[in-house]
Regions:
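Mobile, glycine-enriched helix-loop/loop "lid" segments at the mouths of ligand-binding/catalytic clefts
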Residues: 1-30, 302-303, 307-316
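Conserved N-terminal alpha-helix of the aminotransferase class I/II PLP-enzyme fold
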Residues: 11-65, 90-98
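PLP-dependent enzyme catalytic core of the Aspartate aminotransferase-like
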Residues: 55, 105, 310-361
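Conserved PLP-enzyme active-site core in the AAT-like
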Residues: 56-250, 255
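Short, conserved charged micro-motifs
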Residues: 112, 286-291, 346-352
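A common structural junction motif
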Residues: 209, 296-306, 357-361
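Short, well-ordered beta-strand elements within core beta-sheets of diverse protein domains
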Residues: 219-229, 276-284, 339-343
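Conserved small-domain helix->loop->beta segment predominantly found in fold-type I
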Residues: 239-303, 323-329
Length: 361
């Protein structure tokens, strides 16, 4: 946990500093300073590299720090980026508010090939998408992008259910805060890819200071050990809830990756090894959504996801609030939409809670 490493050889330390500043791991060099390298953070990165099938990984203090560094590493001011909606609201806002200086073209998956041009630096997608849970065919997306790097936000699926690098993606992004941490008590992000890309991403982390705290890295590495068990249990419960919610009179539509409306190409079972543990429901309007969210007793009305506790939130007014109304409509982020991150509580307890909240007058 020390911030600095002892320097007994100044010339060697100078060489180490230059080595690290170029985005390399220490590899026998003095780590110099905690912003340049930390062994605990590196252990988490190595674990993520292994589970995602990449050559290297770079961890950050948050998912948005990871997204920002990735964009800085892969693009220059004025570059063209093709992005698929919906994305996490924070990512959407970063791409839309002009801060990055990028020219962003928002498209649907089938429009990517036509949208890519000689100035396109990056294609970006999230699958399952946040918050509608629509699936994107990663292999087809990579083919449509051609030589343009493809970044996939794999937060909802996790490495347990989906490995985008094996399907042609260039880099994979995670908000490690969510399923990887798994207990709602740590914030972090990580990017996985090949060595050359990760050297560039690591250089941005060094320059901007977005390093993951060692204690957070420890918690995230620990969370990876239970991720398969947690995901399997939560997914089983989510499936049972989704099936029952289809029949509830207060629910107009259920979004769940295993349902054809979210997965018309049959990607669950091929691209994904399971549907995951997220469910979204449309209850018609903001008033009803507010009533449901404020009526739950076992579930926690809160943003974030992937915890052992079941969380319910209203994307249009919370996580995706900063999107303009037209963009929300195009992305399917309606005022009646509620996103549910299913946790590890007993399925009947969760159903009873949802049923009473949906039936409240």
């Amino acid at each position: 946990m020390a911030t600095s490493a002892r320097i007994d050889d100044l010339k060697g330390a100078a060489q180490s500093f230059a080595h690290l500043a170029q985005g390399h791991r220490p590899e026998g060099h003095n780590p110099i300073y905690g912003r340049l390298h930390n062994d605990t953070v590196a252990a988490f990165e190595e674990a993520m590299m292994s589970v995602e099938g990449g050559d290297d990984a770079v961890a950050f203090g948050s998912g948005m720090a990871a997204m920002t560094a990735l964009l800085f590493a892969a693009t220059q001011h004025g570059d063209h980026v093709v992005a698929l909606r919906p994305l996490y609201g924070g990512s959407d806002h970063l791409l839309s508010d002009g801060l990055t200086g990028l020219k962003v073209k928002w498209v649907e998956a089938h429009e990517v090939a036509a949208a890519v041009n000689e100035d396109t630096a990056l294609v970006l997608a999230e699958t399952p998408a946040n918050p509608t849970l629509d699936l994107v065919d990663i292999q087809s997306l990579a083919m449509a992008a051609g030589d343009v790097p493809v970044v996939i936000d794999n937060t909802f699926a996790t490495p347990v259910l989906q490995n985008p690098l094996e399907l042609g993606a260039t880099m994979v992004l995670h908000s490690a805060t969510k399923y990887i941490g798994g207990h709602g008590d740590v914030i972090g992000g990580v990017v996985v890819g090949d060595e050359e890309w990760m050297k560039q991403v690591r250089q941005i982390r060094i320059g901007t200071g977005g390093l993951l705290h060692p204690m957070a890295a420890y918690l995230l590495r620990r969370g990876l050990g239970t991720l398969p068990v947690r995901m399997e249990a939560a997914q089983t419960t989510a499936r049972r809830l989704a099936i029952r919610l289809v029949e509830h009179e207060a629910v107009e539509r259920v979004h769940f990756p295993e349902f054809p409306a979210c997965d018309p190409k049959g990607l669950v079972g091929t691209q994904m090894r399971g549907p995951g543990a997220m469910v979204a429901i449309d209850v018609g309007d903001a008033d009803k959504a507010s009533q449901v969210m404020e009526s739950v007793q076992l579930m926690t009305p809160a943003v974030s996801l992937g915890s052992t506790d079941t969380l319910i939130q209203h994307p249009a007014l919370l996580t995706h609030q900063l999107m303009d109304e037209e963009a929300k409509e195009d992305a399917g982020v309606s005022l009646g939409l509620l996103r549910i991150s299913v946790g590890l509580e007993a399925v009947e307890d969760l159903w009873n809670d949802l049923d009473q909240a949906l039936s409240a007058r």
